[in-house]
């Protein structure tokens, strides 16, 4: 049986509106589990998630890294 890995998590908050943003940026927000202002989402800290956060520095901020 596989042992469960306790991975690190990162919490992001949406601080910008997706209105008048390209469809790719809207899709990235949805991929992060965000869709409305000031909502927070806790995700596994992976390179893919970090890349999505890096693409949207004007729309999201990292609240907590655990």
Swiss-Prot record:
Belongs to the universal ribosomal protein uL30 family. NCBIfam families: rpmD_bact. GO terms for cellular component: cytosolic large ribosomal subunit. Part of the 50S ribosomal subunit. This is Large ribosomal subunit protein uL30. Pfam families: Ribosomal_L30 (PF00327). Gene3D superfamilies: Ribosomal protein L30, ferredoxin-like fold domain. GO terms for molecular function: structural constituent of ribosome. Keywords: Ribonucleoprotein, Ribosomal protein. The keyword Secreted does not apply. InterPro entries: Ribo_uL30_ferredoxin-like_sf, Ribosomal_uL30_bac-type, Ribosomal_uL30_ferredoxin-like. One of its GO terms (biological process) is translation.
């Amino acid at each position: 049986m596989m042992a469960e890995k306790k991975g690190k998590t990162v919490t992001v908050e949406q601080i910008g509106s997706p209105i008048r943003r390209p469809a790719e940026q809207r899709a990235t927000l949805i991929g992060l589990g965000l869709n409305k202002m000031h909502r927070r989402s806790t995700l596994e800290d992976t390179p893919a998630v970090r890349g999505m956060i890096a693409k949207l520095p004007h729309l999201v901020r990292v609240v907590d890294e655990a």
